[in-house]
Each structure stands twice: as structure tokens, then as C-alpha cells.
């Protein structure tokens, strides 16, 4: 998944609501092509984005010299994939999992269990001689110590591979009832039946070994926005089963005796009865305030689920949200809106704000836009 690598700073002393927005243009260069459902990473002032809808392309932008634009790097050496997760260790970017076809003539997509390493010093990709122990599609990852990578969530490879194979080989027009039964059976399961990864896994790049650090007390979820503060990671929202999100926000601190901490959940968006939760949102820190923006969900899915409908998003349209939330004094507030609803892009904390890169629009196209969301005198500034 597209992930965030940020320093979580102390919250603002002021509790004033940020309610106004200002817009400025033509500072941040757009992507050469739209990127959604890809991977992202940050090393110093350089931000990296690619894969997903960009196929095998991988780009870098020096945020201290945006006038130089995006540079195309070496082409990814593995099969094209979406929904992978990436983490930096040293000067290397490690890419784990994702979903796609193993070959051009493959009958259906699969969840990949492969790992790749991009050396930013030599501009070269390498396949790592290891295999992920679980499916990491939609997982979140980070390095708590610059030595290892920790993972949260991720789809079940056996279950999702079977679903993709069944739905791909069934002709929807010729066999509509059978096709619909496959969808209903898979989408109608309870959250735990999906067997998403509930363990906090560790990967050591030095010896390519995997380990289980602990187990999450929460329902496993995928597509969370993430914010990193040294050994801690904050996991914001995400989905707990296909089509159903959670508004939960929790923090994991590596090395602590009790590593998990629940925090305030995201509030309901203005005009909505409850917060559906969001997946694929953008997040970061600006002016000592944690921001979360955009993300996708299905308005009404939570109500249907609470009424007993396990196929929670059945009959609902996918919503691409534009709300911006800020966390002040430990409490979330809605403080503004993006120029458009976006999800499944990349976000980075940089000087002046949160840099939002690419993503998926409501018409399902991949965006090339790059926005900087900042704060100025308690006002949301959006620079593109």
C-alpha cells in the first residue's frame, strides 16, 4: 500500500478549530503519470513513488529542489503489482507483497509472497531470497529501529487467491448466478473469517529471517494510514473486511511491555450520522498537528453491518472523500476539505506541510496531482 513515513510531533497548544482554506498554485510538480495503489518511501528530502497503476515505473523527487521535477529511476524487476507495502532500512527501500499476475499469461491474479530491495545509491533492484510468511496485501509496515521491518495486517493469501481464481474463471454473463454466489459468499463473511494477519511480524534484512513480535488485540485491518514517531507507529482507520472500515486509531510502540494504545477515533464527517472509517487515506504532521485527509469508504456500510448484513457494502457506491481531520489536544476535528475526493495515493511530511502525491479519483482514474497541505495562522493552505 502507499504508506507514510513521518515524525509525530507534539500537538498544538491551541485548540482553535481550523476552518478556513487558502489555495495557491504552481509550486509542486505533477507526476509524469498517475499513480494509485502503489508504494512510497522517504529518505531525507527525497520521496519515492511508483508501481501500482504506474506498472513497473518508479520515481523520485527531491523536495528541496522541486523545480527539478520527478526523475524516473530503474524499472522494477518483478511482476507488476498493486497494494504492496514498502519500508526504508538504511539506503534501501524494501517492497513486500502486493497483488497482480505472476506472468502475462497467468489465468488470474495472486497475492505475491516475494520481496524486493531497491538500492537508492546504485539505482538497482534486487530480489531478496525470502518468502513472506503471510499475504501482505494491504498491510502497513515500518522500521522501529532502522534495522528491522514490522508489519500489521494483510490479506490471507490462500483465501484471496482462491476467490480471485474462482471469480476470474466464471463468466458473469454466461453464469450470472454462479458468479454472484462467489461474490456473495466471499463478501458475506464475518471479519475474522477472512483470516487477515493479526500478528505483528518482523523481517530482518541482515539475515532475511522472519519472526512474530506479538499479536494484535484488535481486529486485523488493511489500508490504514500511518504516522511514524521513532519506535512508534500510529495506525489510522483502514478496513476490517472488504467494504467495511473502522474509525479506530491506535498506536504501537516497539519494545514496550504493553505496546498497544487506543486513542480517540475519527469523528463523523459533517453531515453524516457516523464515521464510516476510511481506507487509503493521506496522513502526516504539519505545524505540530497530525492531519488525515481523503480516503475511500462506502457510506451506509456500517449501518448495514450493524443490522446484520455481513455483505456490508452490498448495493452501495464507493465514496472518495475530501475531508481533512486534525488532531489537537488528543481530539480529532474536521478542519477542511481537499480540492477533490482522493484515496490510495502517497503522503509525506516535508517542510511546510503534508505532501500528497497521486491517488485514485472518484472516476477510478489515477491522479498525477501533487498537493502540499499546510497550516498558516490556523488556516488550511493547499498548494499545488
Swiss-Prot record:
Entry keyword Repeat: yes
Group of enzyme by EC: isomerase
Keywords: Carbohydrate metabolism, Isomerase, Kelch repeat, Periplasm, Repeat, Signal
A GO cellular-component term linked to this record: periplasmic space
Location of the protein in the cell: Periplasm
A Pfam family matched in the record: NANM
InterPro entries according to UniProt: Gal_Oxase/kelch_b-propeller (IPR011043), Kelch-typ_b-propeller (IPR015915), NANM (IPR056734), NanM_proteobact (IPR019936)
Reaction catalysis annotation: N-acetyl-alpha-neuraminate = N-acetyl-beta-neuraminate
EC number(s) from the headed UniProt entry: 5.1.3.24
Signal peptide: 1-24
Cysteines paired by S-S bonds: none
Active site: 239 (proton acceptor)
Kelch repeats: 46-90, 92-145, 147-184, 185-230, 233-281, 303-352, 354-383
Top-rank taxon: Bacteria
One MF term in the entry's GO annotations: racemase and epimerase activity, acting on carbohydrates and derivatives
Subunit annotation: Homodimer.
Protein's job: Converts alpha-N-acetylneuranimic acid (Neu5Ac) to the beta-anomer, accelerating the equilibrium between the alpha- and beta-anomers. Probably facilitates sialidase-negative bacteria to compete successfully for limited amounts of extracellular Neu5Ac, which is likely taken up in the beta-anomer. In addition, the rapid removal of sialic acid from solution might be advantageous to the bacterium to damp down host responses.
Family that this chain belongs to: Belongs to the NanM family.
PANTHER family noted in UniProt: ACYL-COA-BINDING DOMAIN-CONTAINING PROTEIN 5, FIBRONECTIN TYPE-III DOMAIN-CONTAINING PROTEIN
Protein name: N-acetylneuraminate epimerase
Source organism of this protein record: Vibrio vulnificus (strain YJ016)
Gene name of this polypeptide: nanM
